[in-house]
Amino acid sequence: MTTLTKQLAEQLQIHKEDDLIKDLQLDQWFTGQQLADDVATLHDFFQEIGLMNQDLALVCLDNSAVYPVLTQAFWELGVVEHPVAATTPIAQLLTEFNEHTYAVIVVKQELAEQLTDQVPLQKKIVKLNTSQELTIFINTELLSKRPNDTGTSPNEEDLGLILNTSGTTGKPKRVGLTHRILNNAAHHNIDSHKMTSADTTLITMPMFHINAQVISTLSTRLSGGKIVIATKFSASHFWQQISENHVTWTSVVPTIISILLINDQANHIYSELKAHIHLRFVRSSSFALPERKFIAFQDRFHTKILEGYGMTETSSQSTLNPINAQKIGSAGKPVGTDVAILIDGKYETKGTAIGEIVVRGDHVISDYVDSQPNAFHDGWFLTGDLGYFDEDGYLFVKGRSKDMINRGGEKVAPAGVQSILSQLDFIEEIVILGMPDDLYGEAVTAVVKPKNSLLDEATMIAQLQDYANENLAKFERSTQIYFVQDFPRNPTGKILRPQLKKQLLSI
């Protein structure tokens, strides 16, 4: 066993009589013993069909209590789990299967029926405490060609997870995370969030994603805490789920925070249950939360927001705001990570100049599964994000280097402009893009998702322009303004800027 799998097994034994994971869809808690029994059942099944160290497993499941036990069983054998979105269409699954050599595919029931006639795989059903019917497709052709030996045991440098990057700026990259990297990341999370066995976390984020996989699930399990799993986020159920299950923290994205602020039913339920809600904090990541929403959420729901900065390549977070020393608008301070700003070939850790954020540490990858050496230099991972440190050592992220707008030689950082304009009351969300322009090369373009406002577009444009004139440099002001009902997004709520740009170009 690796250090990681040994700790996971030990926690189940320590808490074998205790409720550890609740599946809200089933309305059922599972004890450490029940979870350990499921891990053993899956371990034996996978061993019987011939899975070996570093075999690949494709997983397409909804959030549920079976996810953590499936992952642990894979890791104990050294199998590399590659989870994908539960909404992945069958055609995309088949493309993934054909491009890579998977030993097994684990899918939800709706996809199993479609997949049966599409792939030359053997279908098996495994019954567990956490899932009465877990459908597993076996690549018998691959496994039958194996020599009759038991293979090697997993070690610290073997891959445990392959995750696709969120792919908001192009084709997703495959990120491979080793047992060592995953274990290190989880313990950095435990330390920085001060997690203990007294904590209970609510998972509403998709479990194929690094946030739920490592920050919420793995870190909580290694700290001995409890996990409550929702199939997906529901504004009308959120505060009830927090209250009834004594949740002490949860990890979300700014989109969820925005919804909770404007959803009348959620606000009504909170007002009725607030005496029974004892959150230590709500963790927010993926993209920056506008200051007015940050303040409004903390004031209305009487809990702290902790913003951080991380990515799949760092196996979760690299920075986090200290629990008792938050700085609004920042991504916090480095956590178990060396973070620097690359400016003119120099790695700066002080000063306030903007440059590319680079990171290194014991939880950061050294290459992609499909090698991309240009993403690394001198032991640093080049994130492609722009940012700076303030005088107190807090990191401020200003956007992607690829998103930087070049207006006639003057550079505009979209995130900074978005942060300022989002203070306008009628703006729910705003995206600043560079659109083709014959004169300047790129035109600063604002795309606004308004709140339910009684203002007409002409009035909103006038207010936006007046506010920009008062608060932005002339070259930062938008010369084009569009209004949309919503933005194209990935499964975690990130806005897909390339798709948005294509939509605007087609108008």
Residues covered by each model-derived region:
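Conserved ATP/PPi-binding loop(s) of AMP-dependent carboxylate-activating enzymes
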Residues: 330-336, 346-377, 410-412
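Conserved pre-ATP/AMP-binding loop-to-beta segment of ANL
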Residues: 16-19, 145-164, 171, 194-200
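Conserved AMP-binding A3 loop
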Residues: 29-33, 160-184
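AMP-binding/adenylate-forming catalytic core of the ANL superfamily
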Residues: 361, 367, 386-476, 499
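Gly/Ser/Thr-rich phosphate-binding loop
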Residues: 247-252, 265-326
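Conserved AMP-binding/adenylate-forming core of the ANL superfamily
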Residues: 20-50, 55-64, 71-72, 89-94, ...
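Conserved AMP-binding/adenylation subdomain of ANL enzymes
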Residues: 183-200, 208-249, 263-264, 269
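AMP-binding/adenylate-forming catalytic domain of the ANL superfamily
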Residues: 470-494
